[in-house]
Amino acid sequence: MEHWGQPIPGAGQPWRQPLPTSGRWWLGAASWWWLGAASWWWLGAAPWWWLGTASWWWLGSRRWHPQSVEQAE
């Protein structure tokens, strides 16, 4: 404990400095990483979800209303 508050050799920062700074950076980076991961998951899952929903709706509309397209035209 005799080095408490003394600069780390080669780092030029006090011993007590990196802990809060790295802690805040880690929390900030983790939140951004989770946000990015959720965004990538949403971007990856959303098209499949929309494709599945559109396919079910299209198949259902064709099955129950086969003349809907012809009537629209």
From Swiss-Prot:
Any Gene Ontology CC annotation: mitochondrial outer membrane
Tissues/organs with expression: Detected in brain homogenate, primary neurons, and peripheral blood mononuclear cells (at protein level).
Conditions for induction: Up-regulated by endoplasmic reticulum stress and proteasomal inhibition.
Taxonomy, superkingdom: Eukaryota
Organism from which the protein derives: Homo sapiens (Human)
Name of the protein in its database record: Alternative prion protein
Protein encoded by which gene: PRNP
Compartments reported by the entry: Mitochondrion outer membrane
Main location group: mitochondrion
Membrane topology field: Single-pass membrane protein
Keyword Metal-binding in record: no
Transmembrane segments: 32-52
Additional remark text: This protein is produced by a bicistronic gene which also produces the major prion protein/PRNP from an overlapping reading frame.
Lineage per the UniProt record: Eukaryota, Metazoa, Chordata, Craniata, Vertebrata
Keywords on record: Membrane, Mitochondrion, Mitochondrion outer membrane, Transmembrane, Transmembrane helix
